[in-house]
Amino acid sequence: MTTFPSAESASCADSFGGSAAPVTVFGPDFPFGYDAWVKAPTGLGVLPAEALGREVAVIGGGIAGLVAAYELMRLGLRPVVYEAERLGGRLRSERFPLPTAHDDGASSDGSSEAVAELGGMRFPVSSTSFYHYLELLGLRTEPFPNPLTEAAGSTVIDLGGETWYAETLADLPDLFKEVAEAWDAALEREFGLSGLQEAIRTRDAQTLKSLWNKIVAAWDETSFYEFVSRAEEFADLSFRHREVFGQVGFGTGGWDSDFANSMLEILRVVVTECDSHQELVVGGVEQLPVGLWNRAVNDSPRWPKGTTLASLHTPRPDPSEASRTGTPRGAVASLRRLADGRIAVTETSGEVCSYDAVLATCQSWLLTTEIDCDESLFSQSLWMALDRTRYMQSSKTFVAVDHSFWKEIDPHTGRQVMSMTLTDRLTRGTYLFDNGPDQPGVICLTYSWMSDALKMLPYSAEKRAELAIRALEKIYPGLDIRSHIIGEPVTVSWESNPYFLGAFKGALPGHYRYNHRMYGHFMQEDMPDSERGIFLAGDSISFTPAWAEGAVQTALNAVWGILTHFGGRTHPENPGPGDRYPELGPVELPE
């Protein structure tokens, strides 16, 4: 657990050089500047005239699918999006249907509504490709109220029945400082964290690769907990220190749910500062994928000015008649390779369409559960990687409250009556969202992973809220949380949804090779024809699962792959990820 400067101080610079430049998600496995590629005025590439207007199936309307579809439309292709539920995927903002305190009967916009972020809710500013699309749509962000941040105001840590109130790390007992110092020192001694981050700041790809490749070879088969338990910085400390580290974590809360994961997975998060400087999207992050669906392109070589993904999905002869009524195709039931080499996509309704290229952005397990997929579309080694992907469970339960009552000061203690809360009780993490004066507030009563999430799985939203409130009442005796709740609770367990089967990937020790196979699948030049034309994207295909940046970067990989598949090319002055992959691609470990 560490304290961090405000997100404003970490805003992304336009140039990358010197220690003043920010840390971004530049690698470390594949140090390619996706943000620079997508922002370049030359564009992502050029298609041959005969390819313009050709259809590409995009399975999944989450952020990976929508980014890819939007960029493919800009290039001049016709994306056909298939979505089983609703646009957004795990960027799902559930709105509480509540009037504002000064409701005059007029409809209110998203900024005045209480929102429960059921999926992605905190977005590190190091995610510069993801933020490119936020900026494109003019969406606002604010610092996320993580523990011990200015945005949270105050934090309560409740462990083993003992409770501490803090506004900074200095307010906590020495035990917590010792844990934070041990973690930071272990990262620096074992991995040279500052050197890795300096290479990222300066975008020195060769230095970064030389450092990171050695780490991959040495640490792929080591778990997060093995690192913590064996590090000499923790060896002189008690088991209690490791226990506190698991319960409280560093930056964003407890990490014991990740103790079984590969240390490489955790190190990537730390090296790229995904664990710090996080922001929320005002009004809900679902505005981003929905906004891309409705955003007009004005620079496409094929589509008239004003064309949107929505208008391409409406039965109108002129796609320039931009419409917000366009809807994606439905859920996909099967994928088949046809005799002519095209790929047939069958919907659950029975409708069949064939395509020269298909992009699957769904969770990889769906290719063997919900979708009857020709085995010949992927190599057996890739099937092994797709099936061995391990998804983590996640549960959240939210309630809307009449106002941000937790900011009130207890006259007896001089402290806020309630705080962002980390605990070993079943709530684990409780987050408080202040929507401003005279506006309803939102409480994420509980955000938990893995076994803690499974405790909630069988129960209704009402029962989950009741269990969480009971736990919080033990931490805040005398505080009447219930009296402030308005409306019904909102909850999610991603593992119970057949179109997700889990919240996000958590790679286990020894999974690097699997990740490498999935991530590099967009490089299809050496593949047999039977495996070409189907592409993969999504955060679980990336090296940074659970972060939207990974979804965006793999979507851009797929865009390059599809561009190349149709005979297109990038601009010489703006090479794409596939152009640099032979030189900078992830290190290959022996099989």
Task: Indicate residue ranges for each PLM-predicted region.
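Conserved flavin/dinucleotide-binding core of flavoenzymes
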Residues: 2-43, 342, 393, 400-401, ...
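N-terminal Rossmann-like FAD-binding beta1-loop-alpha1 element of flavoenzymes
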Residues: 51-81
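Active-site/ligand-binding neighborhood in enzyme catalytic cores
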Residues: 202-331, 341, 366, 371
